[in-house]
Structure formats: C-alpha cells, structure tokens
C-alpha cells in the first residue's frame, strides 16, 4: 500500500496529456500575444525594483557582507551568466510545453504531482510576497513625490494598523494593487499594452541616468577595483542576482503566444 501511495504522489502527466488538456475548448486561452508583447513582458518583469534599489547596497556593503566596489561589474557578469543558464532552461521547457503554469507544469511533467504541488504553492507565495513588497515600496516613493509637491497624506492612510503610531491601511499600496488587478482582469492584451508603456518609461529613466552620469565618470574611483577581493564580488553577485529575476514570467504566457 505504501508503494501505491508513493506512486500516486510522484505520478507524472505526459506532455501529450498536458497539451491536450490545455487545448480543451472549455478553458483554452486565446493566442493574442506577439513577440513584442512577450519581450515587453520580460523586460518589464526583469527591470524592477532590484536594478534601482539594490545596487548601492551591493557596492558599499553593510555590517553583514562586504561590498564589491567597482568590481560590481564582475558581480553583474556572474549573476547574468547564472540567470542566462536558468533562462535557457525555461526557454527549452516553454517550447516543449507551451501552456500556462510555468514551473508547476514543468514539475508535473518531470518530477511528479506532489513536487509540482509544492512548486505551485511556492510560486503563489513568491508572487504574493513580491506583490506586497513592491506595492509598499511604490507607496513610499509615491508619498515622497507628493511631499515634494507640497501634499502630505494623513498618517493613518499610509501606515498599516499595529504600528507604533497606529494606522488604518496603506491605501496607496492597496490602490496600485487594485488598479493592476483590474488591468489583468480586463485581458492579457491590455496588460501587455500597459506593460509596454511602463517598460518604455523604465528604459527612459535608465537612459537618463546613463546620460547624466557618463560625463561625471572619474577613472580614479575605479582603484582599487575590488577593495574586498572576490569575497565582496561574490557577496554582491548574490544581491544583484535579484536584478535579473523575472524572466520566468515569459514562460507563463507561452499558451497565449
């Protein structure tokens, strides 16, 4: 009996069965995404808070890890190579199994139902926590912009209950989550268009920083190149790795491309 239970836990679903289930008329997804849409979705997922927030910490370091200094370039190369190998795996899987589900579906086809179940719930937890963290971070930036404009939101409207000063809810964070949810519910094509607009804004910001910062480059600041040695470069690589993640979001849209 024990062997039967184990077999059921680790039973796999064939690729043919997965494709047949996805092609069922009752829950078949429309193929509306183009190569540009997928590219925009991928860039939008990758160029997130990581590239804007984590670089300073990776360069300088903190009390718990050394900084990379100018060697941050090597940290980006190491993290980029690691993510490239993972992205190639996702590309291979998404072409073999072009259905929604991403890592959950791939796990179901290769590792079994139980491990796929764990993977699926991990993905839900990952996206849920990431959504909350990004929404709170966006709320902080939004509040700072309002202060620069001379507008101060009440404390109770920007802080959750249970804090030292008390609050009702972080309404800016809740509102941005609601707006994004509405766009997603309207349709994937509309979501892709909204993502394309946001991607263009992100690229403009990055190009602006490059254009403004390039004239201020001072080669003297590149010495020493690795003040903390390879320990600093490795520690920074673990941080800037998060500036690359997000490419897996493309594989979730394979069924609609």
Task: Give short role names for the model-derived ranges.
Residues 1-56, 60-69, 73, 84, ...:
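Membrane-interface "cap" regions at the ends of multi-pass membrane proteins
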Residues 14, 20, 24-30, 69-73, ...:
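Helix-loop-helix junctions that connect adjacent transmembrane segments
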Residues 29, 92-95, 118, 122, ...:
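Membrane-water interface regions at transmembrane-helix termini and the short interhelical loops
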Residues 31-42, 112-125, 172-176, 228-240:
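Select transmembrane alpha-helical segments in multipass membrane proteins
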Residues 34, 48, 93, 112, ...:
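Hydrophobic/aromatic residues within transmembrane alpha-helices of membrane transport systems
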Residues 43, 47, 74, 78-82, ...:
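Lipid-exposed faces of alpha-helical membrane segments in multi-pass integral membrane proteins
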Residues 53-161:
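Extracellular loop-to-transmembrane helix junctions
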Residues 84-91, 132-135, 139-149, 182-189, ...:
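Structural signature of transmembrane alpha-helix termini at the membrane-water interface
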């Amino acid at each position: 009996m024990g062997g039967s239970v184990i077999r059921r836990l680790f039973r796999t679903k064939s690729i043919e069965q997965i494709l047949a289930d996805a092609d069922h008329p009752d829950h078949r997804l429309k193929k509306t995404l183009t190569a540009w849409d997928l590219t925009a979705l991928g860039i939008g997922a990758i160029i997130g808070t990581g590239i804007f927030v984590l670089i300073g910490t990776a360069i300088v370091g903190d009390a718990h890890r050394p900084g990379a200094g100018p060697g941050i370039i090597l940290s980006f190369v190491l993290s980029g190579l690691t993510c490239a190998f993972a992205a190639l795996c996702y590309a291979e899987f998404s072409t073999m199994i072009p259905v929604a589900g991403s890592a959950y579906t791939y796990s179901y086809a290769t590792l079994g139902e139980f491990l796929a179940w764990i993977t699926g719930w991990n993905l839900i937890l990952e996206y849920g926590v990431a959504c909350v963290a990004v929404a709170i971070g966006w709320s902080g930036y939004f509040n700072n912009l309002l202060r620069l404009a001379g507008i101060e939101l009440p404390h109770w409207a920007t802080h959750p209950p249970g804090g030292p000063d008390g609050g009702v809810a972080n309404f800016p964070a809740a509102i941005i989550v609601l707006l994004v949810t509405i766009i997603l519910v309207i349709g994937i094509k509309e979501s892709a268009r909204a993502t394309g607009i946001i991607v263009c804004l992100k690229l403009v910001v990055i190009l602006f920083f490059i254009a403004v910062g390039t004239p201020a480059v001072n080669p003297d600041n590149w010495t020493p190149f690795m003040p903390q040695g390879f320990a600093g470069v490795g520690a920074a690589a673990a941080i800037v790795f998060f500036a690359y993640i997000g490419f897996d979001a493309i594989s979730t849209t394979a069924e609609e491309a």
